[in-house]
Design a protein with these regions (language model features):
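Bacterial N-terminal signal peptides that target proteins for export
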Residues: 1-9
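Active-site beta->alpha N-cap acidic-glycine motif
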Residues: 22-87
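Catalytic domains of cell-wall/extracellular-matrix polysaccharide-remodeling enzymes
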Residues: 100-191, 199, 209-230, 236
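Substrate-binding cleft of extracellular glycoside hydrolase catalytic domains
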Residues: 68-116
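Structural preference for beta-strand elements that scaffold enzyme active sites
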Residues: 25-27, 49-53, 72-76, 118-121, ...
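Cleavable N-terminal signal peptides
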Residues: 10-11, 21-22
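N-terminal signal peptide c-region/cleavage motif recognized by signal peptidases
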Residues: 16-19
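C-terminal domain-boundary segment and adjacent tail
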Residues: 144-154, 213-314
Length: 315
């Protein structure tokens, strides 16, 4: 007798859980918190799975980090790092030429200024994250605080993953910037792109900012998320397998040769019909060890087995 025949409830429960198990995971992080409480409070009115990254030297850094944490949100340190371009830098911006002691001092002060932080991501930082020696010093400092690193990927040649080797610091990477342009149509396009990547690759991290246009787009589009997309915190993606989503290039079509002559179609042998019991055995064997099934089996033993043992024996 097959496994499903013995426990039909298991099959029904599995079918109910399968959409959740296959849902695309979308993480949204809003950077630059700590300067504009009015805008930031509108972000804090959104679902608590949306996380915030707080600039450590911003005037409202501690206040906004505490408020976000009290709501159950994930808080990150949004640490300024040196860009390739020459522009005014915030105080305590990390540079590749800094000593390990100086980097440790800045990170220690940032941890004090942004309470409840569980991760850190870079503000700008194309020059810093492209430097392997510089990022190795950052990862060594982060390892003392058990913070993960969310790479904002401001440069394609980032060395964050290589630099984390041997430090125990976990690295995850941004897939989409929502608001490089503050045009609402462009932000919607980027939001849709993030959803598509989450659906096809299993997960995606999108980064935005508390601009009025970004806030309006999120207010409009978050309630319309499809059922196969679930909002998650960045830390929930730390152990996700990394699957790069890139559209597959299409092979150029071969030109037709009108002089190939007449080709005869080969008669294919019809496939042998599969019996129902064989089909269910194959399906059962492929999913019995999945997480939803193991959960239900455990619950089944908890709910049903005790009831069976308590039934008095018949004389």
């Amino acid at each position: 007798m097959s496994y499903f025949t013995k426990t039909p409830l298991l099959a029904l429960s599995l079918l109910a859980l399968s959409p959740l198990a296959l849902a695309g995971k979308l993480s949204i992080v809003i950077d630059d918190f700590g300067y504009r409480p009015h805008n930031e409070n509108q972000i804090l009115a959104m679902p608590t799975a949306i996380s915030v990254a707080v600039l450590p030297n911003a005037p409202y850094a501690r206040e906004m980090a505490t408020k976000a944490h009290q709501q159950g949100r994930e808080v990150l340190i949004h640490l300024p790092m040196a860009p390739m371009s020459k522009q005014p830098l915030e105080r305590d911006t990390l540079r590749p030429d800094m000593s390990s002691d100086e980097i440790q001092r800045i990170i220690r002060q940032s941890v004090n200024n942004v309470p409840y932080a569980v991760g850190l991501n870079n503000h700008m930082g194309s020059a810093m994250t492209a430097s392997l020696p510089g990022m190795q010093k950052v990862m060594q400092a982060l390892s003392a605080y058990q913070l993960y690193f969310l790479d904002s990927m401001t440069i394609g040649s980032s060395q964050s993953s290589q630099a984390s080797a041997g430090t125990g610091v976990k690295v995850i990477k941004r897939k989409v910037f929502l608001d490089d342009s503050q045009n609402e149509a462009e932000i919607r396009k980027q939001f849709t792109r993030a959803v598509q990547i989450a659906r096809r690759s299993g997960s995606a991290i999108a980064i935005g900012h508390p601009h009025p246009s970004t806030i309006r787009v999120l207010q409009q589009m978050l309630p319309t998320l499809d059922a196969d997309i679930v909002l998650v915190r960045p830390s929930q993606l730390l152990n996700e397998p990394t699957r790069q989503y890139e559209p597959q290039p299409q092979q150029p079509a071969k030109p037709r040769n009108p002089f190939r002559g007449i080709q005869q179609c080969r008669v294919k042998q019809p496939p042998e019909p599969m019996k129902n019991d064989v089909f269910f055995r194959l399906v059962s064997s492929s999913i019995q060890e999945s997480a939803p099934v193991m959960f239900i089996k455990h619950r089944w033993q908890t709910w049903v087995a005790p009831a069976e043992t308590e039934t008095p024996a018949q004389p």
